[in-house]
C-alpha cells in the first residue's frame, strides 16, 4: 500500500519564515524592545563612565562632558541649576559651586549629547545618579551645552566684623576679590556652626540678624542658605547662586562663636553644688533660663557641662528664690549629647516670653546617690514614700500625687501595682522635710525619675502631708498543697520571700479576703495544725486584722503576734468555695433529690460513677440537711437535662463542704442522662454522724448496702504526704489530736490496698517502706499491721495497737495507689524538663496525652502545674521518625480556673497504642531574667523553675554559657561571664550548677548541668552576664552575582518571548494548511484523501495519533517542510 503525503498549498516554508516576525503580535515586539533597552542600560555600569570640564579657565570650570561606552559627549542645559552644579563640583574635587553656565560661557562641543533634563537633589555622589531622560536621549543642540564654574575654595575668604574679636561679628565673604555680606533669611544655628567651625572659633553660641553687628557694604553674596551643619565651608551649603538675593544690608547676619563669647554657667540656691536655679553669663551679665520646653535632655547637657553627675531632674518653677536681671534663653531644645547648653536650639539671646517665676533649674546625680523606698508600712512594698538624693532625705508632697504616681513607685520597686495611696499629715513644726514635688506621671513610666518636671529641694509643702503607698506585692498570698482548686496552706509573700502564717493569726475575715483576692469565691473553712502539710522557711510574726470587705490581703492592718512564737506544725490552711453552689432537685422535700452543682456559672447534674455514701454525707451536711440516709441508683429523681458533670469527689465523710474534698475530672468515665447522682438526707439539721463501734466497722458483720448507710463514721482520719498527690506518699493517721505515721514492719500490698481503697485511690501498686517519702514526725501510731485486704479502714486491720511499736521514723510506711497521677514533659533528646511530650502517670505507668482539642488554656494549666511558666505553646514532635507509644487519655479540655490538669474534663482513661503525631508536645516559656544590672542586658542570671525564681552557681561558668543566656534574651553576643555575685547576691533556690554549654544552644535549659536544685554553692557565687545589647543579623550580598542573575533573567525573558512568537506563527500556518486542503476546489483528490483518512482510522491507529494534537519536536521534517505519515491507511473507493 502506498504512503499518503499531504502537501500544503501556498508558498514554501522558507517564505513563511521570512514573514514570521510580520505576524508577531505588537505586544511581543514591544516586550523585546523594552528588554533590549534594559540590557543596554544594565550594561552601563558606574565603572565605565567618566566626567571632565573642558575649555574653561582652570580645572574647575568649563563645559561638562561625560564619557559613556568609550565615547565623550556633552550635557544639555535644560533645567540646569545650582543643585546640578553642586554635584559636579563635588564629584570633581572642586567642592564650591560658583555658577551654572550655559553654552555662551564655553565653546560648543561636538559628538554625542549624552544627557538632557538632568534633575539633581544636590546630595548625589555622581551626576549620573541624578534623574535624566536616558542616555543619548535629548531635544537640544550643542548650542545648549551645559557648563559650570566651581572653586577649590583657595581664592575665597571669610571673616567676622564689628564683634570685638575675630570670633564674633557680622559675617563677610570675599569673592572675586570683593568682600560682601550674608542675608539673614532662614539663617539658623546650623549655619552659624559652619561659620565657627570654618574659622576655627569653636562651636556656635548664637546668631543674630537685622544687622545686629552693624550694616555692611558692598555685595550681598548669599541668601537663603541651606546648611546641615556638617559642611567644611559656608559656600559649600546649598544656595541660589553667588550674588542672588532679595535683601538689603539691614538684614546682614552675624554670629558669636564659643572662643569669642564671654559665657559661663552656674547653679544657685540649690541644696548641693550640683542643684539649683540655672544662670548663664552672656556678654558680661548673668541671667536666667526660661523653663518653656525645659526637659531632661536640657538638664543632662547642663550637668555634663558643669562636671556634675548625670541629670536627675529638670526643675521648672522652683520653690527657691526667683532670679533677677536678664532672661537670656527660652525654648531650649537639646538632644542631650551637646557639650554646652548654647549649642542647643533656642530663641535668640535675650528673646523670651517668660517671667522669673518660670526660671529653670536642675538636680544632677549619677544614680548612686538616688534612692526610693517605702518605710513604716511593714514591708518594702508599703509605707511612706521616701527619697534620698545626694545623701539628703526627703518625702513626697501630696500635691500632684495620685494612684498613677503610686503605681510607678510600686513598679519601680518590683512590688506589682498600687492598691491604694494615702497621706499622712504633719504639723508646721515638723514640716522640715526636703520635699519632692511631682507634676503628674502618666503611669507608664518605669521609674519615678522618668516622670516629667518633678522638682526637688523645696522646703514647703502646702498641705504638710506626705504620700503613702500600698502595693499589691506588699502581702501577696497563695494556697499551696491542696488537692482541689482554691485550697491549701496559706503562704504570703513579703517582698521576695514567701512565708507561712500561724493558725492563731488568721481569722475568718482574713480568709474571706484571701479567697476574694484569689478569685476563689467565699471561704468554706479554716484548717489549722498544718492540715495541708508543714511549710518551710519564714513564719510571719504578724496577726492579720481584716474587716472582711477588703479586696486584697495587703489592705488589712496587721499587729504583732500576741503569743510571740509559732512553728510550722501550726501552719494555717484555707478552703475556698469552688464547689459550694449545690442543690437537690425533683425531690419531695428540700433534702432529697438529684444532685446538681454549679461550675463555672453553669448548673449540671453530677455523674454517679464515683458517687458514694461518704460524698453524700458531706453533701447533706453542706445543705444543712443532716446526714445521708441513702443514695438511690438510676434516675430515681429524674434524668435531668443539660450538662452532666464528671467530677469525681473523694470525700471521707468528715468534711463540712464539698469544697473540702479532693476532686478529679481527668479520665472520668462517660455518663448517660440516667447515670446521675441522688441522695436522701435525714433532714435533721442537728443530726451528725456518731463514732462507729467495732461491730459496725466490721465489714463481715455489716448489713449496709450500696444505697443505705449506717449513721456513723470512723473517728480517725488518713492522709498521704510528700508524694506529689493525694494518692501517693507517706501514710499518716490522725488519732487523739495528733498526726502520726505507720511502721513498715510486715507492711505489704494487702495493707496498702486498704489504704488506697479508704482514700478512694483505687488499688495499691506499690507498698513502700524505709521512709521512701521522707521521715515523718510525731507519734508512730501503728506497727505490724496485718490486713486481709478487705477492710474498709486501716485501723480495722490487726496490729500491736495504737501507739505500740519498736520503730523509728526511718521505717515510715508509704504507698502508691493506682489513682495516683503525676505529670511530666519529656524529650529523650533534651534535658529540658519544661519542654517535650506531655505524659501522665496513672495506674502505675507513664502514658502520653492526646492532642485532640488541646487548647492554649490547657497548656497554661500544664505549665503552671509543672512550675515552668504561666504559658506555653503546642509544638510538633521533636523527631520526624514515626514512633508508637502507650497513650492514657485524650480530649483534655481545661476551662478557665483549674489549677491542675486533674480537674480538667477529658475522654475516659483508656490505654492504647498511639503514634507520635497523635501526642501532645508542649514547650513552656522558659523564663529567664537578668537582675540588678545597668540595663536589661546585664545582671545576675535568674531562672524560673518550680514556681519560684532562683539563681545559677558560677562553678564552670564561662563565656559559652553567657553566650547562650544573651542569645536567649535577644541581647546579642556576650561580652563577659561574671562570677562571685558581681551584681549582688540573689535569694531563693540556686537552681543550676556546673553549667557546661557549647555556646550554640538556643536555651540554657539545653545545656548540660547538674540536676535542678542540686548545688553546693551559696549566693555569693551567683553567676552573671554582660551582653552587647546588639541583635546580630547576618546578611550576605553579592552585587556582581546579582547583576549576572539579572542579565540571565532578562535573557530568559527574551528567549521566552521569541518562543511564544514562534508558537503563534506555527499555529497560524497549520490553520492555513487545513483550510487549503479542505476548501480548494481545483484539487478534489486532496479533499477525498483527507476525508477518507479521517473516516477509516482504526482503534490501533489511535496510539499513534492521540499522543499529540499537533506535530512535535520528534516529527520528521523534510527539506521541503513536509510531514511524513508512516502508517499506511486504506482508502475506500
Curated annotation (Swiss-Prot):
Residues 1066-1133 are cytoplasmic. InterPro entries: SRCR (IPR001190), SRCR-like_dom_sf (IPR036772). It comes from Canis lupus familiaris. This is Scavenger receptor cysteine-rich type 1 protein M130. It is a single-pass type I membrane protein. Involved in clearance and endocytosis of hemoglobin/haptoglobin complexes by macrophages and may thereby protect tissues from free hemoglobin-mediated oxidative damage. May play a role in the uptake and recycling of iron, via endocytosis of hemoglobin/haptoglobin and subsequent breakdown of heme. Binds hemoglobin/haptoglobin complexes in a calcium-dependent and pH-dependent manner. Induces a cascade of intracellular signals that involves tyrosine kinase-dependent calcium mobilization, inositol triphosphate production and secretion of IL6 and CSF1. GO terms for biological process: acute-phase response. Residues 51-151, 158-258, 265-365, 372-472, 477-577, 582-682, 718-818, 823-925, 928-1028 form the SRCR domain. The SRCR domain 3 mediates calcium-sensitive interaction with hemoglobin/haptoglobin complexes. Disulfide bonds join 76-140, 89-150, 120-130, 183-247, 196-257, 227-237, 290-354, 303-364, 334-344, 397-461, 410-471, 441-451, 502-566, 515-576, 546-556, 607-671, 620-681, 651-661, 743-807, 756-817, 787-797, 863-924, 894-904, 953-1017, 966-1027, 997-1007. PROSITE patterns: SRCR_1, SRCR_2. Pfam families: SRCR. The chain crosses the membrane at residues 1045-1065. A soluble form (sCD163) is produced by proteolytic shedding which can be induced by lipopolysaccharide, phorbol ester and Fc region of immunoglobulin gamma. This cleavage is dependent on protein kinase C and tyrosine kinases and can be blocked by protease inhibitors. The shedding is inhibited by the tissue inhibitor of metalloproteinase TIMP3, and thus probably induced by membrane-bound metalloproteinases ADAMs. Phosphorylated.
Amino acid at each position: 500500500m502506498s504512503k499518503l503525503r499531504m502537501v500544503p498549498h501556498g508558498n514554501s516554508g522558507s517564505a513563511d519564515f521570512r514573514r514570521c516576525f510580520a505576524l508577531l503580535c505588537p505586544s511581543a515586539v514591544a516586550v523585546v524592545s523594552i528588554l533590549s533597552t534594559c540590557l543596554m542600560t544594565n550594561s552601563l555600569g558606574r565603572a565605565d563612565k567618566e566626567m571632565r570640564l573642558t575649555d574653561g579657565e582652570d580645572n574647575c570650570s568649563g563645559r561638562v562632558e561625560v564619557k559613556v561606552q568609550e565615547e565623550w559627549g556633552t550635557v544639555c542645559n535644560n533645567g540646569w541649576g545650582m543643585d546640578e552644579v553642586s554635584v559636579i563640583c563635588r564629584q570633581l574635587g572642586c567642592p564650591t559651586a560658583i555658577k551654572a553656565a550655559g553654552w555662551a560661557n564655553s565653546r560648543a562641543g561636538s559628538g554625542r549629547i549624552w544627557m538632557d533634563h538632568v534633575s539633581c537633589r544636590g546630595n548625589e555622589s555622581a551626576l549620573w545618579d541624578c534623574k535624566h531622560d536616558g542616555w543619548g536621549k535629548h531635544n537640544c543642540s550643542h548650542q545648549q551645552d551645559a557648563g559650570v564654574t566651581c572653586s577649590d575654595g583657595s581664592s575665597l575668604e571669610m571673616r567676622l566684623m564689628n564683634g570685638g574679636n575675630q570670633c564674633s561679628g557680622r559675617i563677610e565673604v570675599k569673592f572675586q576679590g570683593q568682600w560682601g555680606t550674608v542675608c539673614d533669611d532662614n539663617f539658623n544655628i546650623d549655619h552659624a556652626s559652619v561659620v565657627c567651625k570654618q574659622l576655627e572659633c569653636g562651636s556656635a553660641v548664637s546668631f543674630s540678624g537685622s544687622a545686629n553687628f552693624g550694616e555692611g557694604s558692598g555685595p550681598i553674596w548669599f541668601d537663603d542658605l541651606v546648611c546641615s551643619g556638617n559642611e567644611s565651608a559656608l559656600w559649600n551649603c546649598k544656595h541660589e547662586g553667588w550674588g542672588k538675593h532679595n535683601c538689603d544690608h539691614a538684614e546682614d547676619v552675624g554670629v558669636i562663636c564659643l572662643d569669642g563669647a564671654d559665657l559661663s554657667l552656674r547653679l544657685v540656691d540649690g541644696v548641693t553644688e550640683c542643684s539649683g536655679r540655672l544662670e548663664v553669663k552672656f556678654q558680661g551679665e548673668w541671667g536666667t533660663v526660661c523653663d518653656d520646653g525645659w526637659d531632661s535632655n536640657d538638664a543632662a547637657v547642663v550637668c555634663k557641662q558643669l562636671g556634675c553627675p548625670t541629670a536627675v531632674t529638670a526643675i521648672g518653677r522652683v520653690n527657691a528664690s526667683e532670679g533677677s536681671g536678664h532672661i537670656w534663653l527660652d525654648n531650649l531644645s537639646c538632644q542631650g549629647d551637646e557639650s554646652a547648653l548654647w549649642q542647643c536650639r533656642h530663641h535668640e539671646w535675650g528673646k523670651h516670653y517668660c517671667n522669673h517665676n518660670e526660671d529653670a533649674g536642675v538636680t544632677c546625680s549619677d544614680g548612686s546617690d538616688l534612692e526610693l523606698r517605702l518605710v513604716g508600712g511593714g514591708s518594702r512594698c508599703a509605707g511612706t514614700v521616701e527619697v534620698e538624693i545626694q545623701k539628703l532625705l526627703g518625702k513626697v508632697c501630696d500635691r500632684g500625687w495620685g494612684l498613677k504616681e503610686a503605681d510607678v513607685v510600686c513598679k519601680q520597686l518590683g512590688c506589682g501595682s498600687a492598691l491604694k495611696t494615702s497621706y499622712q499629715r504633719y504639723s508646721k513644726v515638723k514640716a522640715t522635710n526636703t520635699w519632692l514635688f511631682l507634676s503628674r506621671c502618666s503611669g507608664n513610666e518605669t521609674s519615678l525619675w522618668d516622670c516629667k518636671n518633678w522638682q526637688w529641694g523645696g522646703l514647703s509643702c502646702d498641705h504638710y502631708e506626705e504620700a503613702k503607698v500600698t502595693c499589691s506585692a506588699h502581702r501577696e498570698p497563695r494556697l499551696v498543697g491542696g488537692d482541689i482548686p482554691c485550697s491549701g496552706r496559706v503562704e504570703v509573700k513579703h517582698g521576695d520571700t514567701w512565708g507561712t502564717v500561724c493558725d492563731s493569726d488568721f481569722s475568718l475575715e482574713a480568709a474571706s479576703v484571701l479567697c476574694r483576692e484569689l478569685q476563689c469565691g467565699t471561704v468554706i473553712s479554716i484548717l489549722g495544725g498544718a492540715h495541708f502539710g508543714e511549710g518551710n522557711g519564714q513564719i510571719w510574726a504578724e496577726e492579720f486584722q481584716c474587716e472582711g470587705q477588703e479586696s486584697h490581703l495587703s489592705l488589712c492592718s496587721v499587729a504583732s503576734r500576741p503569743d510571740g512564737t509559732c512553728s510550722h506544725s501550726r501552719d494555717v490552711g484555707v478552703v475556698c468555695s469552688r464547689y459550694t453552689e449545690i442543690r437537690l432537685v425533683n425531690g419531695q422535700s428540700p433534702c432529697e433529690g438529684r444532685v446538681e452543682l454549679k461550675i463555672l456559672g453553669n448548673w449540671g447534674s453530677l455523674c454517679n460513677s464515683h458517687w458514694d455514701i461518704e460524698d453524700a454525707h458531706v453533701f447533706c451536711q453542706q445543705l444543712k440537711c443532716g446526714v445521708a440516709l441513702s443514695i438511690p441508683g438510676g434516675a430515681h429523681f429524674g434524668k435531668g437535662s443539660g450538662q452532666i458533670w464528671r467530677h469525681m469527689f473523694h470525700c471521707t465523710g468528715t468534711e463540712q463542704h464539698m469544697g473540702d474534698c479532693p476532686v478529679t475530672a481527668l479520665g472520668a468515665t462517660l455518663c448517660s442522662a440516667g447515670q446521675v447522682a441522688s441522695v436522701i438526707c435525714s433532714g435533721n439539721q442537728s443530726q451528725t454522724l456518731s463514732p462507729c463501734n467495732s461491730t459496725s466497722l466490721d465489714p463481715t458483720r455489716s448489713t449496709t448496702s450500696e444505697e443505705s448507710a449506717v449513721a456513723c463514721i470512723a473517728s480517725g482520719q488518713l492522709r498521704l504526704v510528700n508524694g506529689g498527690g493525694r494518692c501517693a506518699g507517706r501514710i499518716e493517721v490522725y488519732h487523739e489530736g495528733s498526726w502520726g505515721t505507720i511502721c513498715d514492719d510486715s507492711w505489704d500490698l494487702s495493707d496498702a490496698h486498704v489504704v488506697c481503697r479508704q482514700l478512694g485511690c483505687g488499688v495499691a501498686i506499690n507498698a513502700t517502706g524505709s521512709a521512701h517519702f521522707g521521715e515523718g514526725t510525731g507519734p508512730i501510731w501503728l506497727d505490724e499491721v496485718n490486713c486481709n485486704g478487705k477492710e474498709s479502714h486501716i485501723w480495722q486491720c490487726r496490729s500491736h495497737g495504737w501507739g505500740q511499736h519498736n520503730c523509728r521514723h526511718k521505717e515510715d510506711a508509704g504507698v502508691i495507689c493506682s489513682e495516683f497521677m503525676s505529670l511530666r514533659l519529656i524529650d529523650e533528646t533534651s534535658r529540658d524538663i519544661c519542654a517535650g511530650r506531655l505524659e501522665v502517670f496513672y495506674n502505675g505507668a507513664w502514658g502520653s496525652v492526646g492532642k485532640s482539642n488541646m487548647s492554649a488554656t490547657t497548656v497554661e494549666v500544664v505549665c503552671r502545674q509543672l512550675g515552668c511558666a504561666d504559658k506555653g505553646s503546642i509544638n510538633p514532635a521533636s523527631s520526624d521518625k514515626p514512633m508508637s507509644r502507650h497513650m492514657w487519655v485524650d480530649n483534655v479540655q481545661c476551662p478557665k480556673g483549674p489549677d491542675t490538669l486533674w480537674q480538667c474534663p477529658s475522654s475516659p482513661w483508656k490505654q492504647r497504642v498511639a503514634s507520635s503525631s497523635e501526642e501532645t508536645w508542649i514547650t513552656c516559656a522558659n523564663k529567664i531574667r537578668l537582675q540588678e544590672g545597668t540595663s536589661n542586658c546585664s545582671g545576675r542570671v535568674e531562672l524560673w523553675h518550680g514556681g519560684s525564681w532562683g539563681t545559677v552557681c558560677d562553678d564552670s561558668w564561662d563565656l559559652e554559657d553567657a553566650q547562650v543566656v544573651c542569645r536567649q534574651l535577644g541581647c546579642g553576643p556576650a561580652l563577659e561571664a561574671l562570677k562571685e555575685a558581681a551584681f549582688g547576691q540573689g535569694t531563693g533556690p540556686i537552681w543550676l550548677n556546673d553549667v557546661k554549654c557549647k555556646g550554640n544552644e538556643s536555651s540554657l535549659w539545653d545545656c548540660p548541668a547538674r540536676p535542678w536544685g542540686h548545688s553546693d554553692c551559696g549566693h555569693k557565687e551567683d553567676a552573671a552576664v554582660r551582653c552587647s545589647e546588639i541583635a546580630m543579623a547576618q546578611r550576605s550580598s553579592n552585587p556582581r552575582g546579582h547583576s549576572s542573575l539579572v542579565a540571565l533573567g532578562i535573557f530568559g525573558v527574551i528567549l521566552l518571548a521569541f518562543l511564544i512568537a514562534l508558537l503563534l506563527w506555527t499555529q497560524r500556518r497549520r490553520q492555513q494548511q487545513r483550510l487549503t486542503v479542505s476548501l480548494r476546489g481545483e484539487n478534489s483528490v486532496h479533499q477525498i484523501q483527507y476525508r477518507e483518512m479521517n473516516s477509516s482510522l482504526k482503534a490501533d491507529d489511535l496510539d499513534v495519533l492521540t499522543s499529540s494534537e499537533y506535530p512535535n519536536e520528534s516529527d520528521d521534517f523534510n527539506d521541503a517542510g513536509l510531514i511524513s505519515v508512516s502508517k499506511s491507511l486504506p482508502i475506500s473507493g
